[in-house]
Amino acid sequence: MRDDEATGPLTPGLGRMGSKDPAGISRYNSAIVAIGDELVGGFTLDSNSHWLAERLRLLGYPVKRITAIRDRPEEIVEQLRRELSDPEVTHVFVSGGLGPTPDDRTFASVAQALGREQVIWEETRARIERRVRRMHEAGLLESPDVTEGNLRMARIPAEPAHVFKNRRGMAPGVMYEADGKSIFVLPGVPLEMKGIFTEELEPQFLSGGSAATVRELRFTFAVEARFYPLMRELEEKYPDVSVGSYPNFETKELVIRCLGKDPKRVDEVIEVIRRRSAELGMTGEAR
């Protein structure tokens, strides 16, 4: 879910003002590519991207861009090449399209984008065979034989930097290095994606980030436009702190959110906003 979905629409012409995009605060920046017709068709909520964006922000790998695209190879390849060509993006997270059916085309598309062949990853195939056999013994499958659909999940782009175990499903998570970037290809099933991320990916490959400090002030029945002069002033005086305004027209709240690497600078900005808004007769609640 994007911030404007969580807190309501933005004021036309004012929108989300900031001294710097939060992605610009970190030396690492991420991009998320969510793949699936069910996402862009409005059938399934893209909870994976929302969860990933929050985790990455907390770990110091803030997200520059989230893109949802269809299960179309040419569109997947095009988007991946866009992320690889972006000099600001250091980490790319791809989710979805790793299943056993013909419309699961992510591995093949990643291989094309990276200019690599697809290979059967033997460790993954062996794990799939064991899982299918156990499911047959439990009466969940009629046959203990691995199908072509099962094998699709073991056919990955060649030369992975790391292959993650999926303890909750069959499709593996895979990491690649290309053009100085790290690309993580993860299952679209939320339970599987989160398991791989928290148990292996995060502790092994995301320990070098520096998380931003986040502070908020919440105002009730405040008019967003009244903050415009102050936020423009802060933009000039505190270029290292991102300041954004987020109105929620359902709760009648206006959230002023500040992000920065230096906690003292962020607190200083919050105090300026608190003091100046009080002079205008508005009191913000700290969060």
Regions found by a protein language model. Give the residues of each.
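N-terminal amphipathic/basic leader segments beginning at the initiator methionine
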Residues: 2-32
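Glycine-rich phosphate/diphosphate-binding loop of Rossmann-like nucleotide-binding domains
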Residues: 24-71, 264-267, 271
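Glycine-rich beta-strand-to-loop/alpha-helix junction loops that act as flexible
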Residues: 35-37, 94-102, 187-188, 259-261
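Structural motif
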Residues: 70-81
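Proline/glycine-rich low-complexity loops and linkers
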Residues: 74-75, 88, 105-207
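Short, structured active-site "lid" loops
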Residues: 81-94
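An accessory alpha-helical subdomain
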Residues: 178-276
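Conserved short beta-strand edge segments in small beta-sheet-based binding/regulatory domains
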Residues: 276-287
